[in-house]
Amino acid sequence: YFTAYRIDHILGFFRIWEIPSHSVHGLLGQFVPALPMSVDEIQSYGLPFQKDFMTKPFINEEMLNKMFGDKAAFVKETFVQHVHDDIYEMRPEYDTQRKVEAYFSDKKDEESIHIREGVYALISNVLFVPDRKHPSMYHPRIAVQNDFIFGRLDWKEKDAFNRLYNHYYY
């Protein structure tokens, strides 16, 4: 018999991944303690900071149709509202994952679960998360490179974001 301890993720002993109480998934979390980034610091990587585009869920017609198919009309009527052109935003009554979770609490069928998970993904479709103590400072959202909002960036912006992301997380 051996007396041994295996320590995985040593950073976990010093920094904790904090998930906001309004979130179900961890994508909108941030390390605590952490050094959030200022707008100037973000821009120093060559990424022009656009607060609304980068910190509010990016939702457009194409995305809704891709994610929800024939249920896109239901999602538009229930969870999002039209802003302009083909852009939507979350309705205030469903603007957090916990609010969406409450809506689906008694709906356990496969279709409802698919829609619920899709709406969760809409809410987390941001490039940056405001710091919980300093809202004018930001954390790059974890694992955003496979989301729709990242796809909206041009190649220079993607490169700048990835350099910033790698510096921040690694």
Predicted regions and their residues:
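Catalytic cores of glycan-processing enzymes that make or break glycosidic bonds
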Residues: 1-170
